[in-house]
Amino acid sequence: MKQIINPLKGNDNKIPIWFMRQAGRYLPEYKKVRETTKNFLDFCYDVNKATEVTLQPIKRYGFDAAIIFSDILVLPHAFGWEVDFKENIGPILKQFKSQEDFKYLQINPNDKLEKVYEIIKKVKKELPSPTSLIGFAGSPWTVMSYMLEGKGKQDFKTSKKFIYENKILAEELLNFITEKTADHLINQAKSGVDVLKLFDSWSGVLAEEEFTEFVIEPTKKIVLKVKEVFPKTPIIAFPKGAGLLYEKFIKEVPIDILAVDQMVPLEKMKEWSDKVIVQGNLDPVVLLTNKEIIKEKTYKILQAMKGKNFIFNLGHGILPETPTENVEFLTEYVRLYEEKNSNSTF
């Protein structure tokens, strides 16, 4: 049985564990492969290299799931939008400003996404059983935000101003991204992934009305469309920073697994685990500290979620400066806790 799917099958004894950005710059073996290709997107589309780095954390740590090495911005890039990644800066995109800009978006994707599906098929062949394989996409609001801003920001004033002032155009762009995202996830499932995930990194910048319109509604459309074709494929959603709106999200979006950030109280995670499987939520910065602190913080989460529908993960991605030995210690600690399953002597 696929390890990460155990909670869906009622197996409470297993604590599935994997980490966002588990294949990345904190791994020396990743850096060695990454430095062979200058352009980041070219690296994402290189079938052999992307397969290799997807499998690296599985070989090193034995996580219960591998997540395809890719990026949320391959989607707009595949539809003709200008996307580039600058060293030490991050993504730089052509800025979407008006109706005229739709002419730069193609109706059908180029062959770039086919490379992603080839990577999935190759990883699937090489992935040790019973490790799960996760495919993913950026949620429409987050992808749309990058297009409206032209790069990553913290306040997203440009994006929010745009949706306030250009409701019809914003809805048109949102619908385009929503449709293409659903298709991309369906094609990943067809290629062999076991689980799908939607990353909404910037959902936390929206007020309730806009959160409903730009996060909840498009995510719901995507989930329903995917479930029409793959009703048994679990879907994880991560509306990062949603705060109190996580509850509204759970009520209105028919997901299987809710990923939460480190700001969510453990009591809320316990409460929500009666409705969905909850994934999270160790602060990634904890992995920059020492073993005692890692043990203390991890134990609190494991104790709170003991016997619950739960997947252990971080509240966001592994930081590039994270010591590999700390990731190893954390993984072994979760395994040991699972084995002993005791709140008295452990």
Curated annotation (Swiss-Prot):
Q: How does it assemble?
A: Homodimer.
Its UniProt entry gives the catalysed reaction(s) as: uroporphyrinogen III + 4 H(+) = coproporphyrinogen III + 4 CO2
Task: Fetch the SUPFAM superfamilies from UniProt.
Answer: UROD/MetE-like
Q: Please name the GO terms of the biological process aspect recorded for this protein, alphabetically.
A: protoporphyrinogen IX biosynthetic process
Q: Where in the cell is it found?
A: Cytoplasm
The protein's matches in PANTHER family, at most eight in alphabetical order, are given as: METHYLTETRAHYDROFOLATE:HOMOCYSTEINE METHYLTRANSFERASE RELATED (PTHR21091), UROPORPHYRINOGEN DECARBOXYLASE (PTHR21091:SF169)
UniProt main location, coarse: cytoplasm
Pathway recorded for this protein: Porphyrin-containing compound metabolism; protoporphyrin-IX biosynthesis; coproporphyrinogen-III from 5-aminolevulinate: step 4/4
Its biological purpose: Catalyzes the decarboxylation of four acetate groups of uroporphyrinogen-III to yield coproporphyrinogen-III.
Q: Provide the protein name.
A: Uroporphyrinogen decarboxylase
**Family of the protein in this entry:** Belongs to the uroporphyrinogen decarboxylase family.
Q: Where is this site: Transition state stabilizer?
A: 71
GO CC, alphabetical? cytosol
User: Per UniProt, what is one GO molecular function of this protein?
Assistant: uroporphyrinogen decarboxylase activity
- A Pfam family it matches: URO-D
EC numbers: 4.1.1.37
Q: Which UniProt keywords apply?
A: Cytoplasm, Decarboxylase, Lyase, Porphyrin biosynthesis
- Please tell me where substrate binds in this chain: 21-25, 71, 146, 201, 316
